[in-house]
A protein has these predicted regions:
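Conserved alpha/beta-domain cores
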Residues: 1-97
């Protein structure tokens, strides 16, 4: 049976919550949303997901503008070209490179 992204997300959250109880640690899930439609991000945010990762700057900027939600924490994932540093720093809270 093929799980849709909502069911898959809920399964992952259940596993994370079990590990949090056992290990008494804070675990933060970053959902990589590159190439995905912005409506999926909105749906996951409604379920409590706050951290989303992108590595295509132009695509990410479009999503950030379309969604316009201050509760979402945007993560830039991947290599950085020097000519894009300013735009990345203006749009993302975290950089993972």
């Amino acid at each position: 049976m093929h799980l849709n992204y909502i069911d898959n997300y809920k399964s992952i959250i259940e596993i994370i919550n079990e590990h949090k109880k056992v290990n008494n640690r804070d675990i933060r899930l970053i959902v990589v949303s590159k190439t995905q439609d912005y409506t999926k991000i909105i749906e996951l945010e409604k379920l409590g997901q706050r951290d989303f990762g992108e590595n295509y700057l132009d695509e990410a900027r479009e999503k950030i503008i379309q969604i316009n939600n201050p509760n979402i924490v945007w993560h830039y994932i991947g290599s950085i070209q020097s000519n894009k540093i300013k735009k990345i720093s203006e749009n993302f809270s975290w950089i993972h490179t």
